[in-house]
Amino acid sequence: PREAASIDPQERLFLQHAWMAVEDAGYTRASLQIAPASGQSGQPGQVGVYAGVMYGEYNLSGSLASIANRVSWFLNLHGPSLTLDTMCSSSLTAIHLACQDLRLGRTRAAIAGGVNLSIHPNKYRMLSGGQFLSSDGHCQSFGEGGDGYIPGEGVGVVVLKRLSDAQRDGNHIYGLVRASALNHGGKTNGYTVPNPQAQADAIARALAEGGVDPRRVGYIEAHGTGTKLG
């Protein structure tokens, strides 16, 4: 509690919501001391922490690594602990990497998510200078005349396990991550210009790896920024 007032607000919120996710999953600090898989060495607490973040605006500490590391320290976890920045895809990339480690048996469980706060005006100065912000205060994704987006704030954290482990342990299962894919747009007409074909390739790869028929997809959440470039 003495440190809470001075640490990075993103660090504080991610820790708070990580704790809430752990409680919702039915775990305590003690029950998270999960032993390594059979035949593997290592200390108990084989739970990874993966935090996605876009901007580091709180310069008193100057360390985004602490967003994930503080959770691992507080819960006495010995799995991978990393904070990563891939801009708008940061939280999804964190979940992708968490799932990869689970599938490869490197961890027994994972705490993954993202946090994004706007706590300094320099962020808006940069976005405005790059013509990312909407001129009328509204985001018109997929609409005619859109010229930018309005940044939001938020934090979200989930607890992930292999399906077989979750079923064996009687966990409440909210949903399944069947597959995920990660790539880059490469060289385009400009550094901030998206590559539609690369995005389509990532979607197709995830569908193929997950064995999902695209015709059976019932809900899509898109990254529709509403900028002039899409």
Model region roles, listed by residue range:
Residues P1-G230:
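Condensing-enzyme catalytic core of the thiolase-fold
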